[in-house]
């Protein structure tokens, strides 16, 4: 893989989408990309055509359509397998940069720590579906579960967002553990948008300025 793979993680409401929008404007003029390289921004679930259909199934808030925890895990895994095959690997092999709103560690946090599915089972599945794709750098935008709920109070929640605060606390603790284990760049998402954006940009410059 020749391109760069950047992932932004965090619980809902932490500002991932906002920061990816900022990066999509800045990175092409940052001097970090090679002349022939493009920037691909994507997300999970829903980064591929099949993924968009899976996203609707996964996040459907109709109680009658609620999947079991294991079925939910496998739906996310199917989404990721397609995402890696059709979007991420082709872009990286083409020397492009990929920025993804979530990747495999979200599954560890939500389905592992949140749903209490055995972590080794998840890791074994992920080792297959990721097909060797691994982030060059992961940012963790950290906010408290209470702040997450407050920020989303006027939104119509999807099925995952409708889970209670205890679930969100488990997910958040999972993210913190993973961030420490994998040496992620942790940024307080309670700061203003510009401050967070500047910290992300500075980290990218420090890590990749000599990688062209």
From Swiss-Prot:
Instruction: Name the cystine pairs.
Output: none
An example molecular function term from Gene Ontology annotations:
dTMP kinase activity
- Give me the residues that bind ATP, please: 10-17
What the entry lists under SUPFAM superfamilies is as follows:
P-loop containing nucleoside triphosphate hydrolases
Entry's Gene Ontology cellular component terms: cytosol
**Keywords carried by this UniProt record:** ATP-binding, Kinase, Nucleotide biosynthesis, Nucleotide-binding, Transferase
What's this protein's family per the entry? Belongs to the thymidylate kinase family.
What HAMAP family does UniProt report for this protein, alphabetically?
Answer: Thymidylate_kinase
Protein name according to UniProt: Thymidylate kinase
Q: Which organism is it from?
A: Prochlorococcus marinus (strain MIT 9301)
Annotated gene: tmk
């Amino acid at each position: 893989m020749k391109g760069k793979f950047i992932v932004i993680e965090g619980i809902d409401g932490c500002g991932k989408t906002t920061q990816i929008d900022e990066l999509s404007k800045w990175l092409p003029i940052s001097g970090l990309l090679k002349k022939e390289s493009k920037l691909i921004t994507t997300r999970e679930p829903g980064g591929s055509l099949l993924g968009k259909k899976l996203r609707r199934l996964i996040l459907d808030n109709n109680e009658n359509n609620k999947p079991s925890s294991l079925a939910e895990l496998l739906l996310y895994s199917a989404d990721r397998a397609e995402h890696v095959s059709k979007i991420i690997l082709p872009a990286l092999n083409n020397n492009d940069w990929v920025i993804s709103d979530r990747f495999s560690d979200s599954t560890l946090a939500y389905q592992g720590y949140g749903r209490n599915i055995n972590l080794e089972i998840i890791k074994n599945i992920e080792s297959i579906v990721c097909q060797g794709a691994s982030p060059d750098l992961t940012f963790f935008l950290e906010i408290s579960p209470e702040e997450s709920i407050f920020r989303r109070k006027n939104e119509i929640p999807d099925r995952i967002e409708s889970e209670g605060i205890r679930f969100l606390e488990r997910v958040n603790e999972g993210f913190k553990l993973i961030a420490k284990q994998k040496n992620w760049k942790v940024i307080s998402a309670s700061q203003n948008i510009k401050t967070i954006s500047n910290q992300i940009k500075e980290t990218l410059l420090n890590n990749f300025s000599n990688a062209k």
